[in-house]
Amino acid sequence: MSKSTAEIRQAFLDFFHSKGHQVVASSSLVPDNDPTLLFTNAGMNQFKDVFLGLDNRFYRRATTSQRCVRAGGKHNDLENVGYTARHHTFFEMLGNFSFGDYFKHDAIRFAWELLTGEHWFNLPKEKLWVTVYATDDEAYNIWASEVGIPAERIIRIGDNKGSAYASDNFWQMGDTGPCGPCSEIFYDHGEHIWGGPPGSPEEDGDRYIEIWNLVFMQFNRQADGTLLPLPKPSVDTGMGLERIAAVLQHVNSNYDIDLFKTLIAAAAEATGASDPDSKSLRVIADHIRSCVFLVSDGVVPSNEGRGYVLRRIIRRAIRHGNMLGASDTFFYKLVAPLIDVMGSAASQLQPQQAMVEQVLRAEEEQFARTLERGLTLLDDELAKLTGDTLDGETAFRLYDTYGFSLDLTADVCRERNLRVDEAGFERAMEAQRKRARESSGFGADYNSLLRVDETTRFFGYEHLEHQGRVTALFRDGQLVGVIRQGEEAVVVLDETPFYGESGGQVGDRGVLKAASGVFEVADTQKYGKAFGHQGKLSYGELKLGAQVTAQVDSARRERIRLNHSATHLLHAALRQVLGDHVGQKGSLVNDHYLRFDFSHNEAMKPEQIRRVEEIVNEQIRCNLPIQTDIMALEDARNKGAMALFGEKYEAQVRVLSMGDFSTELCGGTHASRTGDIGLFRIIAESGTAAGIRRIEAVTGEEALASLHQQSDLVQHIAQLVKGDSQTLVDKVRALQERSRQLEKDLQQLKNQQAAQESASLGRNVRDINGVKVLVRQLDSAEPKMLRTMVDDLKNQLGSAVIILATVAEGKVSLIAGVTKDLTDRVKAGDIVGHLAQQVGGKGGGRPDLAQAGGSDIAALPAALASVDAMLAAKL
């Protein structure tokens, strides 16, 4: 019996653990250490700084099953997903890594043992082929002499892009930096499938499939292209879980493995589809994986960046569900089957299931409102098409008005053997961007563009004043040697007590004092490993290399510390009251208040908000010690410390504990004891996106001021209603009851007035072709009264056409009533349509009653005068 996908994943990790590798958890799909990446797309992403020598880990061997997404950016498989056997938006990359430990010999030996070992994957050795870089004799000899693969199944791959080392078998991190040859392992699916070995003209067939890539990082590429040996060569390998599962489960397509068969069956049930081989079911089964894990990792649908890619994937899945006949929301229903089939890889999903379902359902409901209209427009445009290309302007209109991404429109066109003018789409998009830039009035933010090579040591945990040396000066984004009085700049120091904004905590303010001048610091930001002090030189001048005394605004820092510690108490209290699915999704901590975003799929009830507030204040009164410990990241996680989404952690981390109540990883500044916070008060709770809630709160003196403000408000209201705080509620209720009674009395008077006016209006009826017609503009009537008056006049006249109009709040209101015996001759909707067109408005309704509005008051008399001729033609 073949292994399940979950069992294959576990076997891989178990094998390398037995070989001394540290099992490292998958990192987030949102890269935390590489701003150049849209999404994590390879197993080595989380180890990039280790390979570059910028990060040290307590282990030299590691193994992972890394979640990856390839949709958007350089690596974009979206348009092929569902139409090929192996393209996915989401996949898992199994990998083993050596950081200056073992090299080619052990990497190849481990791979061969896992693939062919009787107790592991036990693949037939004759089914495996390998490639090596053309000049990598070392790897070739290991495969041939030590492993024993026949020479005809070892293929040397050379340069194929016209330049040295530009080869499928030579890996490079970039134009410079670590690089080296790689060796790929292929599986032969058999003669019954078309295709040839790697390097042959038929290599693009499906017979020989790459299952594992072993990258040997042994060189450091210089700017001039020369390769220098690395002092500690390393290994980075990657094996697609879905591909090896297809091999071990004896199927040729990834969509035929157990995991996808389960998801496809669930998608068929949710959409009502009957053909299990439908490409649309494959699309949906693939897309639910990427969408669920992206939402779980903190991405929410939006119109920019990662959120827009997520929105595109969700909407593509919804469109394919629509093609299958889904008549109701279906996509969110696949979250539970996915969690069931993912096994241990879904552990992070279980507490977030409800939140993920809520986000997906909300997005589906939103898109459903425009999907049908957008598809109708697209169908109409394609029906009129004379060539084979849809113009870019139409594609952009679908994007801008109906939320159709370019790839969704291209999908529809491809199904009809048509294409989209992508260049025209981009021109329309750029024109819109240009209009937006011109209307915004904002220039470039030079500070956001700074690239700083310096390193700053932070001393702000222990000191608020410290000596430092100026190592860089930036003015208008450019490096300078000196700044002078009145100039704004960014000052970088070698050592500082100023906290640089991170982890939601704002940067410090204060002053830098030098012998030659004083620099007022308005903010502190991090630029890589440097701290940039942003502000203005208020006196003298400041030169590169100058010694300064850096003084933090201590009162402001103290308020920030209290608010930051309060966020930790709030986080723990929310998990107590709402459940363990609550996770931090963002925060802001400044000297006035704190803002905390968290995962939860509905608005908090008033009693829940109060209970959270009570719990936090209980912990404040306990005056718990706030303790900081430095420990290994894995030890911190084993201790139960919560690691926060989007944060990058070193091998050694700061663990902040507040008694037994809260334990989190945190690099921020904090109070010494919870009692220092004094008082905690929630001032607002709201939603920011589907599945994301936000709490705003204040502490200490701000919390006390908030209570005083509320007390003053209560006293003021009590005075207005001639009561006190004890009787205020009863007084307000009495006023509400009095208001309701007055509204009721007023409505009765209005009804009486309408009846009287209706009676008098009945005397103004005229005859058109034997039919009673009443057309009247009423100067004193409210728009709401017109309906009642028409009903009264119908009863009074028996058989008639009635048209009433009034002007209120600068707008025209019209109503037409036709008794049922006349609706086969003239319809109320036609009458108001005729009138609305003349007064600059629109309207509609039933044949016997219709209403309209308009903005052209001056045109109303002429419009009413035109009714007689219209009715004479119809009656």
Curated annotation (Swiss-Prot):
Enzyme class: ligase
Protein name, UniProt field: Alanine--tRNA ligase
Compartments, as annotated in UniProt: Cytoplasm
The protein's Enzyme Commission number: 6.1.1.7
GO molecular function, one term: aminoacyl-tRNA deacylase activity
Cofactor needs: Zn(2+)
High-level lineage: Bacteria, Pseudomonadati, Pseudomonadota, Gammaproteobacteria, Enterobacterales
Keyword tags: Aminoacyl-tRNA synthetase, ATP-binding, Cytoplasm, Ligase, Metal-binding, Nucleotide-binding, Protein biosynthesis, RNA-binding, tRNA-binding, Zinc
Reaction equation(s) it catalyzes: tRNA(Ala) + L-alanine + ATP = L-alanyl-tRNA(Ala) + AMP + diphosphate
Purpose of the protein: Catalyzes the attachment of alanine to tRNA(Ala) in a two-step reaction: alanine is first activated by ATP to form Ala-AMP and then transferred to the acceptor end of tRNA(Ala). Also edits incorrectly charged Ser-tRNA(Ala) and Gly-tRNA(Ala) via its editing domain.
Species of provenance: Sodalis glossinidius (strain morsitans)
